[in-house]
Swiss-Prot record:
Tissues in which the protein is found: Detected in brain.
Gene3D superfamilies: 1.10.246.120, 1.20.5.4770, VPS9 domain
Name assigned to this protein: Rab5 GDP/GTP exchange factor
Subcellular localization(s) per the UniProt record: Cytoplasm; Early endosome; Recycling endosome
Positions of A20-type zinc fingers: 13-47
Species: Bos taurus
PTM-bearing positions, type Phosphoserine: S125, S133, S374, S378, S391, S401
């Protein structure tokens, strides 16, 4: 993809983000500008062409061998192995290396493959010797619970997924490109089976494929991310060194339409950097893409707040380059390669995830090829900045003033905020102490009033009257009763 740098800033024609074959999907530098679908077609064509050339070479060598054999009568009995057998053996070895997803779902091939695999490797199957990590167990449980809602279709998907993981366990010696091809074939085959046989709606197919990707890549991550057989780590170190060497690049040089003096914009920039750094902590390609998407949306929000209008593509790419330079994400190339190799290809070909990922690839390519002309600098200044002899930031510091330095302005603003917070805290503490004193005084006053009342009106407890009723007693004071009620004594 060609990147153009003009005085008004970095510009990328949006058509250059698309597949160069003209299919309408997003292309990728790792696929030589093709989309996933077209790249696979071109790759298979080149592969078939190479196989055909090897076949023709083998036939030519066989003819030469036969001619030499016919001309040499003395060596007829000594030669026990003809070149045809050698050719057959070579062809069988090539055929064995061709891995397609049909091998994973064909019953006959599974039986034969398992026998050969058992003989070649004695390691236990990952379905038996499962990883015990908490994350893997959690993802497995979530995947099983998710498939339960699909009943018979879910059982078939789970069976196919387990077979795929078992097959991949014995294919770790293959190159990372061949393992990637196996994974992409598996994605494509499962999606086609659900759409044709299962009659599953496209939106549900997408959700199922997301869960399948999450399940299998969580298990395969430590084997296929930045493997030792590739130069991914070397590329990571190279891009990190390159970004550190470009630490002097300012937003003005890239024509970044973002004003970090605005607090909301500064927060968005920090969030964007955090998101793109967080990408390395994710294990699933879809989750890594989600970090790129969140980073990009924060960039668009920062531009929108600064310009008070929606951001354009010409505004987005320079800002993304600036975020990458400022954040220097860890293992950037490894993450890009991992997403390219093992993400569900439909995500990279269409949608906002594919668009943002393609722009990130463009940003990395721009950083790798960045020169004086790209930044509208003279070659002399560019060389001085790269060598560390001087820096544009040093030149700005010569005319330093508190109002001109963004960092110092932010520092004074923060100090003012701290001073205000300190005053508020002192007021709150004084009011809290006053409230505490009032509560103590109120409690003491209530206690004193209660004590005064108790002393003034003491509580006396008297024993109950134990006297019995004396109605028939002679000691009753009858004289106090009215005459009709006075008892009369009769002589008996």
């Amino acid at each position: 993809m060609s990147l153009k740098s003009e005085r008004r800033g970095i510009h990328v024609d949006q058509s250059e983000l698309l597949c160069k074959k003209g299919c309408g999907y997003y292309g990728n530098p790792a696929w030589q500008g093709f989309c996933s679908k077209c790249w696979r077609e071109e790759y298979h064509k080149a592969r078939q062409k190479q196989i055909q050339e090897d076949w023709e070479l083998a036939e030519r060598l066989q003819r030469e061998e036969e001619e030499a054999f016919a001309s040499s009568q003395s060596s007829q009995g000594a030669q026990s192995l003809t070149f045809s057998k050698f050719e057959e053996k070579k062809t069988n070895e090539k055929t064995r290396k061709v891995t397609t997803v049909k091998k994973f779902f064909s019953a006959s091939s599974r039986v034969g493959a398992k026998k050969a695999e058992i003989q070649e490797a004695k390691a236990p199957s990952p379905s038996i010797n499962r990883q015990t990590s908490i994350e893997t167990d959690r993802v497995s449980k979530e995947f099983i619970e998710f498939l339960k809602t699909f009943h018979k279709t879910g059982q078939e998907i789970y069976k196919q997924t387990k077979l795929f993981l078992e097959a991949m366990h014995y294919k770790r010696d293959l190159s990372i490109e061949e393992q990637s091809e196996c994974t992409q074939d598996f994605y494509q085959n499962v999606a086609e089976r659900m759409q044709t046989r299962g009659k599953v709606p496209p939106e549900r197919v997408e959700k199922i494929m997301d869960q399948i990707e999450k399940y299998i890549m969580t298990r395969l991550y430590k084997y296929v991310f930045c493997p030792e057989t590739t130069d991914d780590e070397k590329k990571d170190l190279a891009i990190q060194k390159r970004i550190r060497a470009l630490h002097w690049v300012t937003p003005q040089m890239l024509c970044v339409p973002v004003n970090e003096e605005i607090p909301e914009v500064s927060d968005m920039v920090v969030k964007a950097i955090t998101d793109i750094i967080e990408m390395d902590s994710k294990r699933v390609p879809r989750d890594k893409l989600a970090c790129i998407t969140k980073c990009s949306k924060h960039i668009f929000n920062a531009i929108k707040i600064t310009k008070n209008e929606p951001a354009s593509a010409d505004d987005f790419l320079p800002t993304l380059i600036y975020i990458v330079l400022k954040g220097n994400p860890p293992r950037l190339q490894s993450n890009i390669q991992y997403i390219t190799r093992f993400c569900n290809p439909s995500r990279l070909m269409t949608g906002e995830d594919g668009y943002y990922f393609t722009n990130l690839c463009c940003a990395v390519a721009f950083i790798e090829k960045l020169d004086a002309q790209s930044l509208n600098l003279s070659q002399e200044d560019f060389d001085r900045y790269m060598s560390g002899q001087t820096s544009p930031r040093k030149q700005e510091s010569e005319n330093w003033s508190p109002d001109a330095c963004l960092g110092v302005k932010q520092m004074y603003k923060n100090l003012d905020l701290l001073s205000q917070l300190n005053e508020r805290q002192e007021r709150i503490m004084n009011e809290a102490k006053k409230l505490e004193k009032d509560l103590i005084d109120w409690t003491d006053g209530i206690a004193k009033e209660v004590q005064d009342i108790v002393e003034k009106y003491p509580l006396e407890i008297r024993p109950p009257n134990q006297s019995v009723a004396a109605i028939d007693s002679e000691n009753v004071e009858n004289d106090k009763l009215p005459p009709p009620l006075q008892p009369q004594v009769y002589a008996g």
